Amino acid sequence: MSQMEHRSPGVAAYALAKGRFAEIISDLVHVDATVLLAAYRAIPRLYAITDATAAGMPDGTFEWGGRRVIKKGQRITLENGTTLAGSAVTMLDAFRNLISLGLSLEQAAEMTSTRQAEYLGLQDVGRIEPGARARAFVL
């Protein structure tokens, strides 16, 4: 994605200014915590996503998509060690990250479940209420 600059704002700034729905990788690797909170305050229906490219993998160097990558903690980089290639953060990790940033349980649940269903126009999933399909698990 293009960088956000004051004279050439790019897609991210447009989402902040005009977005009704937008997704954000809530791994604190792709997006800094301060930027994530700013987006949360600016975009009414911001929802969390994760690429989880190496979730569950041990730290180390491995082949992924025809390239050598390095996994260290939650961060995945190309072999040069600086170019971000992904993260190992699951949606549960993203939920925990949102809580760690000060969002309430309800706000974090909305960002990791409810809003995706709303975006897709699904009325019977993503929430716990009468008539909704039961898809709950204990965290």
Ranges and model annotations:
Residues 1-112, 119-123:
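Active-site-adjacent C-terminal substructures of enzyme catalytic domains
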